[in-house]
């Protein structure tokens, strides 16, 4: 034990005597370990950590999909209450099965109206998720039936905001929409609903009410508005559950074809949907990137340690000659590396804490509850493992070198292994490795940058600048039919168009990147397609000037008019009294008419109640973002919308327009609440956010990698020049010109750089395929990107070479020859 303590003291004294070396190593490691720990902290919290539910591996979602429709909007559909009831009755593979729905309702508090996020949940939802009331109680099965008192369970956040945690909250009455509810319980603060691969399904409701409160008319039973969750019985696999649900779906297709023909059930686990696929892959790519950065740091430090070992070769030789033994000397160097790594890891945790806060400040998309992301035991264990790994990586080569020290040579000239060809080769190999790894990271970052540039350049098909959006939802009790809805939106448009700074206003229920929806349709006068070949298109019910406001050009035919709006709404009131008109986009014309003329063709919506005649074809845009391309679209003039988006074109500040819109709506209906008024650019930013986040972080890591590689080249080349001062002096003395000296230094430096570039290009070709799903309109092996990345590394390399080269050219031969 005394020997170990003594060795530890000697090692610490040695590091104190070389502060520049120790501080440089600790700083580099703190940065490398810090960013690794930061990314792992997020990865662990978001992807690796178990979900906060009992036996989360047995929890699944149940959805429906059309078997023969390849449209993302129809691949993960919610289900109708009628089907949910049949699943609950017939399925034998589930221990529990529950359903829920998200919405918002207006609440009147002290005469003021505010919007409240409301969850409609079945009585078995909370037991399924292992939730218990913090105070009071949760729903009972009997409260789901009709005729029972309206009860509510509130979130902890709402308990604080609305009732200031007063115990009188239990039993208090709250008015939501047209109903009064009695608060019976409060959920614990840690309760959270599961994430899904469709962001809109995630619920962080302020208030929960029984599921039965969602269904007010018999027609509501067939509306697909429920997300179903279930817990598999112990020992039941997801495949077995899928097989049983397929059988139930087939039975429902026969017994209830109007609702279920052509449908199947899709089962997916909570764990698979806890993070979006894009975020999941992005975090693993970023973790791989920072691990490469760590390897570059280790190579850099290994080179520094080799330089230090060459300077200490005489000391090491004396220790070996005095009987310390080669193994003990090697152990001393490994202990030194371990101490440096330990200090770097401790400081790295501080860097990680700061880096996590900085990364979360960038508001990475799809990360739910970022406030729960923190360094925990798992992260500390990771940091310790990284510290041990780095000690081995950058301490092993010098330790092996020490074990092969030429004792006689070191004692005679102080050169030892430090001046040998072996050390030079090792340094060059490490430089080549640094350059190769830096090129891999730079190539990945360049691919992401080009991809993001393509995404921004492609856009959604029209300019979103100066467009402001406000969502308006009309309560059924005060607006019971299409006529009352149309009257409201007519009046709203008329008033908003007269607001200062407004150059145009329109209404739509199908807004790009926000509220895209699709439906099946029919061609009037043609046979209905079979259920396995449905005709699908996006339906947008808009005011006539919607496309003009977006500045989308007409390609053929004519634009919509106010007369078209009047005729279409009249046809909706009385289908026998005439027909409406509509526009289609170019993608619709290509898909369904090919060489035919679409003008004059008649369409029927899915319920076949309303017919419309095509009067024009408009240019395409990409409603679900550039990655998803254009979609077939139908535009009907109609203001008969229960919920719609008001779109305003204005050059005025958003806050001023928002205030004007809210005052206008308040003047029309005091009980309507406009929660958010946002620029359409906001939705574009959200759509681009994940790629922007990935590109930014990967670019930062690539930049750090390149700086470390340049620092490595500089340190090695400086040492080469310093160790060859006598040789250079002799060359100058016998007539070598500065150009020849310069070429000698350049050859010494650029050989490992060139080797690193070759290896890096090969590695980039092999590894860039892992980025393929994150790229847009650029291939993972894009030759231009690979070439430019290699040229970039080659172009900045002279910055690391310049100072050592100047030193070599400035050597005085007389001074050099007088040195030993």
Segment roles from a protein language model:
Residues 1-22, 270-276, 304-331, 335, ...:
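Alpha-helical transmembrane segments of integral membrane proteins
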Residues 1-23, 53, 112-113, 147, ...:
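Membrane-helix entry/capping segments
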Residues 18-46, 50, 296-298, 341-345, ...:
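Short, strongly hydrophobic transmembrane alpha-helices
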Residues 31-65, 306, 355-364, 437-466, ...:
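Alpha-helical transmembrane segments
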Residues 39-42, 302, 338-407, 450-451, ...:
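Small-residue-rich transmembrane alpha-helices
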Residues 51-104, 223-229, 455, 459-521:
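Membrane-proximal extracellular/periplasmic loop immediately following the first transmembrane helix
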Residues 118-141, 150-281, 357, 444, ...:
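Mid-to-C-terminal secondary-structure elements
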Residues 297-341, 711-751, 757, 770, ...:
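Interfacial "coupling" helices/loops that link adjacent transmembrane helices in transporter permeases
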């Amino acid at each position: 034990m005394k020997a170990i303590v003594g060795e530890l003291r000697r090692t610490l004294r040695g590091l104190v005597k070389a502060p520049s070396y120790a501080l440089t190593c600790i700083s580099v490691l703190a940065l490398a370990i810090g960013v690794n720990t930061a990314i792992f902290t997020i990865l662990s919290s978001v992807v690796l950590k178990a979900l906060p539910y009992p036996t989360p591996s047995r929890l699944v979602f149940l959805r429906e999909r059309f078997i023969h429709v390849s449209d993302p909007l129809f691949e993960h559909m919610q289900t109708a209450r009628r089907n949910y009831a049949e699943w609950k009755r017939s399925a034998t593979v589930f221990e529990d099965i529950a359903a829920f729905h998200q919405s918002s309702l207006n609440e009147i508090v002290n005469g003021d109206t505010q919007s409240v996020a409301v969850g409609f949940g079945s009585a078995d939802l909370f037991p399924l998720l292992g939730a218990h009331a913090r105070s009071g109680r949760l729903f009972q099965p009997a409260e789901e039936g009709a005729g029972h008192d309206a009860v509510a369970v509130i979130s902890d956040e709402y308990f604080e905001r609305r009732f200031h945690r007063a115990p009188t909250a239990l039993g208090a009455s709250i008015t939501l929409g047209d109903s009064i509810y009695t608060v019976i319980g409060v959920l614990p603060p840690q309760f959270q609903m599961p994430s899904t691969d469709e962001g809109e399904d995630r619920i962080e409701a302020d208030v929960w009410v029984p599921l039965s409160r969602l269904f007010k008319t018999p027609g509501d039973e067939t509306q697909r508005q429920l997300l179903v969750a279930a817990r598999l019985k112990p020992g039941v696999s997801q495949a077995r559950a899928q097989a049983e649900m397929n059988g139930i779906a087939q039975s429902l297709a026969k017994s209830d074809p109007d609702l279920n023909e052509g449908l199947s059930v899709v089962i997916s686990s909570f764990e698979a949907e806890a993070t979006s696929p894009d975020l999941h892959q992005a975090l693993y790519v970023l973790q791989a990137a920072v691990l490469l950065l760590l390897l570059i740091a280790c190579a850099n430090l290994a080179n520094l340690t080799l330089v230090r070992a060459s300077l200490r070769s005489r000391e090491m030789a004396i220790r070996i000659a005095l009987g310390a033994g080669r193994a003990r000397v090697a152990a001393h160097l490994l202990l030194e590396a371990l101490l440096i790594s330990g200090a770097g890891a401790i400081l790295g945790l501080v860097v990680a804490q700061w880096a996590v806060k900085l990364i979360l400040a960038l508001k990475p998309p799809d990360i739910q509850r970022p406030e729960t992301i923190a360094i925990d035991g798992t992260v500390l264990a990771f940091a310790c493992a990284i510290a041990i790994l780095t000690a081995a990586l950058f301490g092993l080569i010098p330790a092996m070198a020490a074990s092969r020290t030429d004792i006689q040579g070191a004692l005679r000239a102080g050169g030892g292994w430090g001046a040998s060809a072996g050390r030079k080769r090792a340094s060059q190999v490490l430089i080549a490795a640094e350059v190769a790894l830096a090129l891999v990271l730079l190539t990945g970052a360049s691919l992401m940058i080009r991809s993001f540039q393509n995404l921004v350049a492609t856009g959604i098909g029209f300019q979103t600048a100066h467009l402001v959006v406000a969502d308006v939802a009309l309560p059924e009790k005060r607006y019971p039919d299409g006529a009352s809805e149309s009257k409201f939106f007519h009046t709203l448009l008329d008033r908003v168009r007269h607001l200062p700074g407004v150059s145009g206003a329109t209404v739509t229920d199908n807004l790009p990147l926000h509220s895209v929806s699709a439906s099946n349709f029919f061609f009037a006068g043609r046979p209905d397609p079979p259920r396995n070949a449905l005709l699908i298109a996006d339906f947008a019910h808009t005011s006539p000037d919607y496309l003009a406001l977006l500045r989308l050009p007409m390609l053929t035919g004519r634009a919509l008019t106010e007369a078209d709006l009047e005729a279409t709404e009249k046809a909706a009131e009385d289908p026998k009294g005439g027909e409406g008109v509509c526009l289609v986009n170019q993608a619709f014309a290509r898909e369904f008419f090919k060489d035919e003329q679409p003008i004059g063709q008649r369409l029927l919506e899915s319920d076949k109640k309303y017919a419309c005649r095509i009067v024009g074809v408009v240019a395409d845009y990409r409603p679900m973002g550039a990655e998803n391309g254009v979609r077939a679209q139908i535009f009907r003039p109609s203001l008969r919308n229960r919920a719609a988006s008001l779109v305003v074109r204005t050059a005025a500040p958003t806050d001023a327009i928002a205030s004007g819109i809210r005052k206008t709506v308040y003047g029309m209906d005091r009980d309507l609440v406009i929660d958010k008024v946002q620029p359409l650019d906001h939705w574009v930013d959200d759509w681009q956010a994940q790629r922007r986040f990935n590109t930014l972080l990967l670019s930062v890591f690539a930049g750090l990698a390149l700086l470390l590689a340049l620092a490595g080249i500089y340190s090695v080349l400086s040492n080469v020049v310093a160790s060859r001062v006598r040789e250079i002096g002799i060359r100058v003395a016998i007539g070598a010109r500065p150009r020849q000296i310069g070429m000698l230094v350049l050859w010494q430096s650029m050989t490992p750089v060139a080797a690193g570039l070759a290896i890096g290009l090969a590695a980039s070709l092999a590894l860039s395929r892992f980025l393929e799903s994150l790229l847009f309109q650029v291939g993972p092996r894009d030759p231009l990107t690979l070439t430019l990345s290699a040229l970039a590394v080659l172009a900045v390399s002279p910055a690391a070479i310049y100072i050592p080269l100047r030193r070599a050219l400035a050597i005085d031969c007389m001074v050099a020859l007088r040195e030993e």
